[in-house]
């Protein structure tokens, strides 16, 4: 089940919210857990056993780590056992096929018989719920959060359906108080609805339209320079609007239930360095990698060379987290290399002024990286890079011109104008969120006033949301890109 589907919008969500607000406070976490398992089982019922098993395992390990004491040797042994089993589960389901295929390629080159392995199906969301479980037991070990004895709350944290499939990557220590006591207000619910609709519009109106352009350009066997750059730019925008759209919808759903999740994007394409980019892109993952991998490797505490090595390894493993493919490994290495270079050069990664040259160079590095991230294999990536940097024919090929529509071109232009407007607005506000406000305000004399700008903005969002639903009914199924990770 996906958020941008009729089943979710018109069946699952209304029934869940109705039951949620009709039930008492003490039963809401249990209802959330049951609903989240139903949501997950809509994909495959049989993987619920794995999901529940991982949850119970980390709940038990958390208790053992907590009982052993903060940062003690016994606690460390329990922690290593817990993390080891978690990574073994993730490694089997996510990397077994890749590992066997790579090994077989080597063996057959020497004339040896290949291994035979039944194809291992990747459970949806496993990368996210494994990482969240690992962060919990590490936080218990570090003393950042006590081990919970409330199995319902912990299981609901792991399973909570708004973020279950594609993040944000949540942490128990940030949400434990909200599970125990969260507020439900009309303002928060209204904010959640607006945020959900914004994400839905991003996904259906922009990302799904640009997906057709990107898919066609990457599929061309002999792309021109124009084809390759069009595909790269279309995918760059598609990925942002798709993934940030999902995050907006997840955050909005959380608000409807009284939760406030962390922000996952802060206008990343306005960045003037790769370091700044990773403070703005997929924030929940980048901070997870920093806190639980980079720091564990030693961070910047063990000399200059080790700092560069740790930056590189963190991003290399971050690339591998995205999938079992050499393309993701190279993408991670690409970003790790530039993070290390920027640290070595001592670049200003907190700019107070907008520098077009720094921005353009950073954006170019990001776009170049997205090409190999999107490519199915190294051959496709090489084909795209060869066309992009041959600087040959900037005209679109006949195949591309025949497929490209005016709506797709207009959507691409609108996407980048939107990115530029909100990115520059965010930069000149020093990345501070706008003060919370509501369309309806009570004046000093007790009269009711309306902020017509906000009223019209929300009316436009509602109109576009309805139009997006109509568009959704006319197009084929289009899952979120990060479902595959």
UniProtKB/Swiss-Prot annotation:
Q: Which organism is it from?
A: Pseudomonas putida (strain ATCC 47054 / DSM 6125 / CFBP 8728 / NCIMB 11950 / KT2440)
Q: What residues form the membrane-spanning segments?
A: 7-24, 39-61, 78-100, 115-137, 150-172, 312-334, 360-382, 402-424, 461-483
Q: Which residues form a coiled coil?
A: none
GO biological process assignments: alginic acid biosynthetic process
The principal localisation class reads membrane
Q: Any idea which UniProt keywords this protein has?
A: Acyltransferase, Alginate biosynthesis, Cell inner membrane, Cell membrane, Membrane, Transferase, Transmembrane, Transmembrane helix
The Gene Ontology terms for molecular function here are: acyltransferase activity
Name a single GO cellular component.
plasma membrane
Residues forming the catalytic site? 322
Q: What gene, per UniProt, encodes this protein?
A: algI
Give the similarity note.
Belongs to the membrane-bound acyltransferase family.
Q: According to Swiss-Prot or TrEMBL, what is its membrane topology?
A: Multi-pass membrane protein
**Its domain of life?**
Bacteria
Q: Does the keyword Membrane apply?
A: yes
Q: What is this protein called?
A: Probable alginate O-acetylase AlgI
Q: In which pathway does it act?
A: Glycan biosynthesis; alginate biosynthesis
EC identifiers of the protein: 2.3.1.-
Name the job this protein performs: Together with AlgJ and AlgF, forms an inner membrane complex which probably interacts with the alginate polymerization-transport complex and adds acetyl groups at the O-2 and O-3 positions of mannuronate residues. Acetylation of alginate is important for the architecture of biofilms and increases the ability of alginate to act as a defense barrier.
* Subcellular localization: Cell inner membrane
């Amino acid at each position: 089940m996906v958020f941008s589907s009729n089943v979710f919008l018109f069946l699952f969500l209304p029934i869940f919210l109705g039951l949620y607000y009709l039930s008492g406070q003490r039963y809401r976490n249990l209802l959330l857990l049951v609903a989240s398992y139903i949501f997950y089982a809509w994909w495959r019922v049989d993987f619920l056993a794995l999901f529940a098993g991982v949850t119970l395992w980390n709940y038990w390990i958390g208790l053992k780590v907590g009982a052993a004491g903060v940062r003690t040797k016994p606690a460390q042994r329990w922690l290593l056992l817990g993390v080891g089993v978690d990574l073994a589960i993730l490694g089997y389901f996510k990397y077994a096929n890749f590992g066997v295929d790579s090994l077989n390629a080597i063996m057959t080159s020497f004339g040896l018989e290949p291994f035979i392995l039944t194809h291992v199906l990747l459970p949806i969301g496993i990368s996210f719920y494994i990482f969240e479980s690992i962060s919990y037991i590490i936080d218990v070990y570090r003393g950042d959060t006590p081990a919970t004895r409330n199995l319902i709350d912990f299981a609901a944290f792991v399973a909570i359906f708004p973020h279950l499939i594609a993040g944000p990557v949540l942490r128990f220590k940030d949400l434990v108080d909200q599970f125990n006591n969260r507020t439900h207000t009309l303002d928060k619910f209204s904010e959640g609805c607006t945020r959900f609709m914004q994400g839905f519009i991003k996904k259906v109106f922009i990302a799904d339209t640009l997906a057709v352009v990107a898919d066609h350009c990457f599929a061309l066997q002999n792309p021109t320079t124009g084809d390759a750059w069009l595909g790269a730019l279309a995918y760059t925008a598609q990925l942002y609007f798709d993934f940030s759209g999902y995050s907006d919808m997840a955050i909005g759903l959380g608000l409807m239930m009284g939760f406030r999740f962390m922000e996952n994007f802060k206008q990343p394409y306005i960045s003037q360095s790769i370091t700044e980019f990773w403070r703005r892109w997929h924030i929940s993952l980048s901070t997870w990698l920093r806190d639980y991998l980079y720091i564990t490797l030693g961070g910047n505490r063990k000399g200059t060379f080790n700092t560069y090595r740790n930056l590189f390894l963190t991003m290399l493993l971050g690339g591998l987290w995205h999938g079992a493919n050499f393309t993701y490994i190279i993408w991670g290495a690409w970003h790790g290399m530039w993070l290390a270079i920027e640290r070595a050069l001592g670049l200003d990664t907190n700019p107070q002024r907008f520098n077009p040259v720094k921005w353009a160079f950073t954006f170019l590095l990001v776009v170049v990286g997205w090409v190999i991230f999107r490519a199915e294999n190294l051959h496709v990536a090489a084909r795209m890079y060869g066309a992009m940097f041959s600087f040959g024919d900037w005209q679109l090929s006949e195949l591309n011109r025949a497929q490209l529509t005016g709506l797709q071109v207009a959507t691409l232009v609108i996407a980048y104008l939107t990115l530029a407007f909100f990115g520059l607005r965010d930069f000149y506000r020093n990345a501070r969120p706008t003060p919370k406000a509501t369309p309806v305000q009570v004046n000093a004399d007790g009269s009711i006033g309306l902020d017509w700008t906000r009223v019209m903005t929300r009316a436009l969002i509602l109109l576009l949301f309805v139009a997006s639903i109509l568009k959704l009914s006319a197009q084929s199924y289009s899952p979120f890109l990060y479902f595959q990770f």
